Amino acid sequence: MPTINQLVRKGRASETTKSKSPALQDCPQRRGVCTRVYTTTPKKPNSALRKVAKVRLTNGFEVISYIGGEGHNLQEHSVVLIRGGRVKDLPGVRYHMVRGSLDTQGVKDRRQARSKYGAKRAKAAK
């Protein structure tokens, strides 16, 4: 326990928090190029084939990014936009694709939560 005098002289060192998405370097999104698009399986107890892509960012980082929504049009050399946000049951996946921007198309026939999947509003049936 420091004395009052020691605190006056030195003060307390503030703890620095580690970034959860270091490759973004404090930017909201980053652009990158897909180097590999593939599926992977989640941790126990879940079971699925999750769509992910390895992406080389403009700042030189190479990260794994999750492709949300049903169906996608991505392949190698697609230019994509990456945002932060991990996938809890996929170890090492700390980023998400932004659907509906650059080469990534929005989810087709999406009715709810459209803004999260880059889907335009459906035309009203008459």
Curated annotation (Swiss-Prot):
GO terms for molecular function: rRNA binding; structural constituent of ribosome; tRNA binding. Residues 1-26, 102-126 are annotated as: Disordered. The keyword Ribonucleoprotein applies. GO terms for cellular component: small ribosomal subunit. This is Small ribosomal subunit protein uS12. Residues 113-126 have a biased composition (Basic residues). The keyword rRNA-binding applies. Belongs to the universal ribosomal protein uS12 family. The gene is rpsL. The modification 3-methylthioaspartic acid is found at D89. Part of the 30S ribosomal subunit. Contacts proteins S8 and S17. May interact with IF1 in the 30S initiation complex. It comes from Burkholderia mallei (strain ATCC 23344). It holds the Pfam family Ribosom_S12_S23. NCBIfam families: rpsL_bact. Keywords: Methylation, Ribonucleoprotein, Ribosomal protein, RNA-binding, rRNA-binding, tRNA-binding.
